[in-house]
Amino acid sequence: MDNITVGGVTLHSPLLNAAGTMGFGSSYADYIDLHRLGGLVTRTMTVKPRRGAEAPRLWETPSGLLNCVGMQNPGYEKFTQVFYKGLVGYDVPIIASVTGTPEEIRRMADALAELPAVAGVEVNLHCTYEEYRTLGSKAYLEQCAQRIRAAADGRLPVWAKLSPCAGDIVDAARTAQNAGAQAVVCANTYWGMALQADGSSRLGSMVGGLSGPAIRPLSVFQTWRVAQEVAVDVVGCGGIVCAADVKEYMAAGAKAVEIGTANFTEPETIIRITEAL
């Protein structure tokens, strides 16, 4: 495939992995040629290391996967000092996924801009059910704007990964665009729950995020809605397992796609789909 520019980032193809589904990439190098990815999206990073959520973190559902990983990561400095070095030789554009306060995001964006192979920053605007209940729609959108503006103050192109559950995703997309995002990703996982007969959760928290083929019709719909309302590039994400799924997102208005849960069961998914397109 020819190179393509999406949201200010030049990619090898329009097929990337979704954040959190390939770690920092090096662990997948034994299974696939990372150079053949359109781009590599890292695990979401924070300023300080996070232990993440309590186990169990995963629960398989029919055609889907519930997770509550809790943003576990070693902190961005571990990436810049250790994991980044293992990726440089693969000649793949790196999109660094980050989250945190505006000040933390600005700090990470500045540091990541010093790494030549990092081509862009994806700001994870994920919001848990509990956080959204506390914030409400207006405060959440203002938080999104502040985070995107902080990243946009840096030297790298900024993508915004939108939540499909925290209010209207179109409002969040417009907010991200107005704050300086050059692309929006539709979308993150959907809030979901898996309970035992006694009412206790099958996960370490009551509410998890649902991904996989079960959410694809929902995410295609949200991609279609957003693509009609913003001028920036749209990246579709959710439930992709084959070339037909990619074409469906493109028909909905996406310029590129991110593939997530499928990488867990078939690490070669992106390569297979690239060859089929």
Give a label for each model feature.
Residues 22, 98-100, 162-168, 216, ...:
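Glycine-rich beta-to-alpha transition loops that act as phosphate-gripper elements at the mouths
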Residues 65, 127-139, 172-228, 232, ...:
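Glycine/Thr-rich beta-alpha phosphate-binding loop at enzyme active sites
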Residues 52-62, 195-208, 250, 256, ...:
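C-terminal helical cap(s) of enzyme catalytic domains, especially alpha/beta-barrels
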Residues 1-93, 99, 106, 273:
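N-terminal capping/small domains of soluble enzymes
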Residues 78, 88, 97-154, 162, ...:
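Conserved alpha/beta-domain cores
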Residues 26-31, 105-115, 166-179, 227-230, ...:
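Catalytic cores of alpha/beta
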